[in-house]
From Swiss-Prot:
Pfam families, A to Z: CcmE
Chief place of localization: membrane
Intervals, Cytoplasmic compartment: 1-7
Origin: domain of life: Bacteria
Compartments where found: Cell inner membrane
Protein name: Cytochrome c-type biogenesis protein CcmE
Protein family: Belongs to the CcmE/CycJ family.
Source organism: Polynucleobacter necessarius subsp. necessarius (strain STIR1)
PANTHER family registered for this protein in UniProt: CYTOCHROME C-TYPE BIOGENESIS PROTEIN CCME HOMOLOG, MITOCHONDRIAL
Known role: Heme chaperone required for the biogenesis of c-type cytochromes. Transiently binds heme delivered by CcmC and transfers the heme to apo-cytochromes in a process facilitated by CcmF and CcmH.
Length: 144
């Protein structure tokens, strides 16, 4: 085999390897993406079907119920409420009336099955998407 052919073969093999690596990286990134939606968007059917996503808002006052390690509560954007079930230990800062972001999937009964619960970490902090959604919900609620 001539050196020219060897060089071409090496270049082709390198391009194939780079292409395979890029596909694997994109596949891994795509499977780990968790879109953020609000309770109003979930109620409107805009939530991703069959894939994990994040839902954020406020934990509704009086909705927190514990049954062993299973916790049931309602997440709200002050316009729509979504029931949530979580099995595990909640973060220390998780409280009723406070902001939270929950990752998981919707089940067939319309309940959000959480795999991860994140509580806001500062008295004044709220994810920008959640703050915007709450502001919009309050604005729409006061316009009625």
């Amino acid at each position: 085999m001539k050196p020219r052919h060897k060089r071409a073969l090496i270049i082709i093999a390198a391009l194939i390897a780079i292409g395979v690596a890029a596909l694997l990286i994109l596949n891994a990134l795509n499977s780990n993406i968790a879109l953020y939606v609000t309770p109003s968007e979930v109620a409107a059917g805009k939530a991703p079907q069959g894939q994990a996503f994040r839902i954020g808002g406020m934990v509704k006052d009086g909705s927190l119920k514990r049954d062993g390690l299973t916790v049931h509560f309602v997440i709200t954007d002050l316009a729509k409420d979504i029931p949530v079930a979580y099995i595990g230990i909640l973060p220390d800062l998780f409280k009723e009336g406070k902001g939270a972001v929950i990752q998981g999937r919707m089940n067939a009964n319309g309940e959000f099955i959480a795999s991860e619960v994140l509580a806001k970490h500062d008295e004044n902090y709220m994810p920008p998407e959640a703050k915007h959604a709450l502001d919009q919900a309050q604005k729409n609620g006061s316009a009625k």
